[in-house]
Curated annotation (Swiss-Prot):
UniProt-annotated location(s): Nucleus
Coiled coil ranges: 5-41
Keyword ATP-binding: no
Motif residue range(s): DESH box: 570-573
Name of the featured protein: SWI/SNF-related matrix-associated actin-dependent regulator of chromatin subfamily A-like protein 1
Family: Belongs to the SNF2/RAD54 helicase family. SMARCAL1 subfamily.
Recorded catalytic activity of this chain's protein: ATP + H2O = ADP + phosphate + H(+)
UniProt keyword Coiled coil, yes or no: yes
GO process annotations (BP): DNA repair; regulation of transcription by RNA polymerase II; replication fork processing
């Protein structure tokens, strides 16, 4: 079927063809100019048979077709000599002069390309002289059967002068090979990948293909001849000469793109594109189809390009003096590139026996493979071998890995999968000399960080900060819940304060908690520099610290500028699904940032696929392709509909890899001696989702209380209304926080609330999420209480205990949990402490975490400081623990105007120990709070629901 092209398409095709022809003509002209310059610079005479054509030489009387003209210019001097072996007929080689007997084709069928290098080059160098007294090099003619690079000799093997001169030349900062403008001719004809021993002397004559009648202009000393022989045959120059890339490699250059960035102009290379995708500051321009990068990544990019054998890049102009680290090698000379090269082309489709290598500890690896006599023989040759009779598997120290793999690869019918590249890179020092113990991380200088923050770090938290800085601020902090990931992250971020602005991405329920934490731990920080982004209309560019939720980040991905060099991701497991909007928005920011701190108490080790995005965010170079990660660690299987990555495999190796490179994880049981018995935390939540009616009621209640009241009854009515409205305002934030806890992997915890409306909403939400729960309130009988407690204590699945503060604060044992959440506050701190002790009882083996949810702009603003003050007074009297405030992560409330102070005093006076005349009075007040119908009530002081008897009791109470 013919394809009709438009005139525009035909025109573009013709233009492209003309450009291609023009480029080809330019290359040919450049090659001819280079050829002429080389001839002039070396004064070399080329003797070509008259029957030679312009594009290839054809010798008369022979059927050999020559397809290319290969030049072999040699530099003058006593140390620059080529020698050729005698012909098979016994005649000695002579100079390439017309009419000489030596220059005629031999009758034995040996053409001009059949000469060989003699075993002793001195034979020909000393037996013949050039009649002109000058050194004459032949123009080499290659036969049609072009030899491979493996069989192609390098002129450095035959010419020690080239090697010596190249060593004396300064290194080029571009680390790429291009034709130099120097007079070293042999540098211009490095065809092979590097010097090495001559495997086939016939290949040399085929490569040069010219009449070998070459004589030296000056005599050669025996010492020089021996050097030539030693270098050419033994290949000792490998250590002296840097390895050059093949002449067929893709060449490109680095050029300035814009201020602070450069681009790479190079042809297509799949390996190079994979490398580009691992650079943090990468950016692809679809219009020009070119990649550009930040100048801060120039050195690392050029260093990585050295590993790509098929690509050469010219240095960026003006960056020649930049120090570029060579490919990493171990101290004893073991090249990590040699280990990485084993990861390529290891598959053997015709293999009859297959196995794989697995890392089993930071010092040993295991080879899983079936029985094979040769393999067992190799295993027994390893000094560090160990055979496990239970698993019937062999293991070895990492220092034997290279030797064993090289030996196994020589067995053609055996295929062994090597260790992955990230494992080789992370444990590179271990392959040189294996050590069992971990290297100790030195303490970093934190003198420029706020002393208040440093003084509150526990020893294990200080170790976490040291680990993070040793990893250059890119890590996965996976400490167990309650071990202070927040304070560690703030300390790490403060260490890199000069690189701010800082972006914090957290669940919406804890955004304001992060803001309070920055104010508390960094007192030197201006409070105005912390910005919590609540809506998409909020600005984020003018502040040093910006805090945003995951959901809002997904909606504002185009508005969030990519200029954040330091990023903290709280609960980073929220990024487990790469297809979600939040993950798509976060990944580009994380890869372009210089410091990335991911915080997660549940790193999803049982499902490695959910961990991939976090690994890619911290170390993009580890696994550029998810499929490679899935094959190794997700037990990937190809199904009829595609690949299934839901499984897991080699989890121990993955854990070792992460702990060695990017992850630090401590469990409560490991650091229990450093933890207090109780750890209280104030979680600031935003009263979002409040209806206009409720918001107006809150404002009106606060306004009424600020006026002052004539009677005690009016005070209590106003406070009761304000307290009830607070419960309604907090419902949405409380539900979000509970769901975040469940998604974070929390299996068992207690939730205390006071209002029936709050308890009902929590139970309803748990039912929707199909989360098992128990509920104990004032309507639960004693028998049911015991059975529910037993169910919670011995449940192996996740379970939430929804409890009333006043009805379930005593007589219950729920020590199987170690987390307590107070959805609401209560004015009597004794009741709160009793509720805490439902978990902190005999049988509790862990530190207990207690979270108080406090909503700004509600009654919590006054209840929370009042509770702390009461506890302090009781502690001084010896009636309660005195360290309530000391073990609570909180911020003091400062009253900005007299009205707020008036409200606080009102709470203090009404709910103080002296304010309640007896317990029955307080019980009546509690009953009023529990029975009030928030959905139907208004701002009036008598908006209570319930039966007539209860209303009469309440009225009697307020009438006092």
């Amino acid at each position: 079927m013919s394809v009709c092209l438009t005139e525009e398409q035909k025109r573009k095709i013709e233009e492209n063809r003309q450009r291609a022809l023009a480029r080809r003509a330019e290359r040919l002209a450049a090659q001819q100019n280079t050829l002429k310059q080389t001839n002039n610079s070396h004064s070399t005479l080329f003797n070509i048979q008259k029957s030679t054509v312009e594009q290839g030489a054809l010798f008369s009387g022979q059927r050999t077709n020559v397809t290319a003209a290969c030049m072999a210019p040699l530099q003058q001097g006593s140390n620059n000599k080529y020698a050729f072996q005698k012909t098979s007929s016994g005649g000695s080689a002579a100079s390439s002069l017309p009419g000489t007997a030596e220059n005629k084709p031999q009758a034995g069928g040996n053409g001009p390309c059949d000469y060989k290098v003699p075993a002793d080059p001195a034979q020909d160098f000393t037996s013949s002289k050039n009649l002109t007294g000058k050194y004459v090099a032949p123009k080499a003619h290659c036969v049609s059967s072009v030899p491979s690079f493996n069989d192609t000799p390098n002129p450095r093997q035959l010419n020690p002068a080239c090697t010596t001169q190249e060593q004396e030349k300064p290194k080029n900062s571009s680390y790429s090979y291009s034709r130099p403008d120097s007079d070293t001719a042999c540098d211009k004809f490095t065809a092979g990948p590097g010097p090495g021993p001559i495997r086939n002397t016939t290949a040399i004559s085929k490569f040069y293909g010219a009449n070998p009648g070459i004589k030296p202009a000056l005599p050669v000393s025996n010492k020089t001849v021996s050097e030539v022989r030693d270098r050419g045959v033994t290949g000792s120059s490998v250590e002296a000469v840097p390895v050059k890339k093949a002449s067929s490699s893709t060449r490109g250059r680095c050029v300035k793109h814009m201020e602070g960035r450069f681009r790479v102009e190079v042809g297509y290379s799949a390996e190079l594109i994979a490398l580009f995708k691992t650079i943090p500051s990468k950016a692809y321009d679809p219009a020009t189809k070119m990649w550009n990068f930040g100048l801060e990544d120039y050195a690392s990019l050029m260093s990585e390009v050295q590993r790509v054998q098929s690509v050469e890049l010219k240095a960026l102009e003006g960056m020649e003096g930049v120090q570029i680290a060579p490919p990493p090698t171990s101290g004893s000379g073991t090249n990590i590139n040699a280990l990485l090269a084993m990861c390529n082309n290891w598959q053997r489709p015709n293999a009859t026996l297959r196995g794989r290598c697995i890392l089993i500890s930071r010092s040993r690896f295991e080879m899983e493979i079936g029985y094979h006599t040769e393999i067992i023989g190799l295993f027994k040759q390893m000094n560090t071998r160990n055979y496990d009779t239970k698993t019937r598997k062999w293991s070895f120290m990492l220092e034997d890995y290279q030797k064993l793999m090289e030996s196994v690869r020589n067995i053609q019918q055996v295929e062994v999968e090597p260790l992955p590249r990230p494992v080789l890179q992370a444990f590179a020092p271990q392959f040189e000399k294996t050590t069992i113990s971990l290297a100790e991380i030195e303490d970093v200088d934190l003198s420029h960080v706020d002393s208040k923050l440093i003084g509150n770090l526990m020893p294990f938290q200080r170790d976490g900060v040291n680990f993070a800085i040793s990893r250059e601020g890119r890590l996965l902090l996976a400490d167990d819940m309650g071990l202070g990931k927040t304070i560690q992250a703030i300390c790490i971020a403060a260490y890199y304060r000069k690189e701010w602005p800082l972006l914090v991405v957290a669940p919406s329920s804890v955004r304001f908690t992060w803001a309070e934490a920055f104010h508390r731990w960094l007192p030197s920080l201006n409070p105005e520099s912390v910005n919590v982004i609540v809506t998409g209309r909020d600005s984020q560019s003018a502040n040093l610290i910006n805090i945003i939720s995951f959901d809002l980040l997904g909606k504002m991905d185009k508005q969030i500028a990519a200029n954040f060099k330091v990023i903290i991701i709280d609960e980073s497991h929220f990024l487990k699904n790469v297809k979600t909007a939040r993950c798509k928005a976060a990944m580009p920011l994380l890869k372009s940032a210089k410091r990335v701190m991911l915080l997660s108490g549940t790193p999803a080790m049982s499902r490695p696929a959910e961990l991939y995005t976090q690994i890619a965010a911290v170390r993009p170079t580890f696994f550029p392709r998810f499929h490679d990660f899935g094959i190794r660690y997700c037990d990937a299987k190809q199904m009829p509909w595609g690949w299934d990555y839901s499984g897991s495999s080699n989890l121990n190796e993955l854990k070792l890899l992460l702990e060695e490179s990017i992850m630090i994880r401590r469990l409560k049981s490991e650091v229990l001696s450093q933890l207090p018995a109780k750890q209280r935390k104030m979680v600031v939540v935003a009263p979002e989702g409040i209806t206009a009616k409720t918001k107006a009621a809150l404002a009106a209640a606060a306004k009424e209380m600020a006026k002052g009241f004539k009677s005690k009854v009016q005070e209590k009515e106003a406070l009761l209304l304000f307290y009830n409205r607070t419960a309604e305002a907090k419902i949405r934030s409380v539900l979000e926080y509970i769901i975040d806890l469940l998604e974070s992997g929390r299996e068992k915890f207690l939730v205390f609330a006071h209002h029936k409306l709050v308890l009902d909403n929590i139970c309803e939400e748990l039912g929707k999420k199909e989360v098992p729960y128990i509920r104990i309130d004032g309507n639960t009988s004693s028998a049911d209480r015991q059975s529910l407690c037993h169910k919670f204590q011995f449940s192996e699945k996740s379970c939430v205990a929804v409890l009333s503060i006043t009805a379930a604060n005593m007589g219950l044992t729920l020590s199987s949990a170690d987390l307590v959440v107070f959805a609401e506050l209560f004015w009597n701190p004794g009741v709160l402490i009793q509720a805490e002790d439902r978990v902190h009882r005999i049988g509790q083996t862990s530190s207990v975490n207690i979270h108080y949810l406090v909503a700004k702009g509600t009654a919590d603003d006054y209840l929370w400081p009042m509770i702390q003050e009461k506890i302090k007074v009781l502690g001084q009297a010896g009636l309660s623990e005195a360290n309530f405030s000391e073990t609570t992560e909180s911020t003091d409330y400062f009253y900005k105007d007299p009205k707020q102070k008036t409200i606080y005093d009102l709470f203090q006076r009404s709910f103080s120990e002296q304010g309640a005349e007896n317990d029955s009075d307080e019980a009546l007040l509690l009953e009023a709070c529990e029975e009030v119908d928030l959905g139907e009530s208004t701002c009036g002081p008598t908006d209570y629901s319930g039966n007539a008897c209860k209303r009469r009791k309440i009225d009697d109470y307020f009438a006092l």
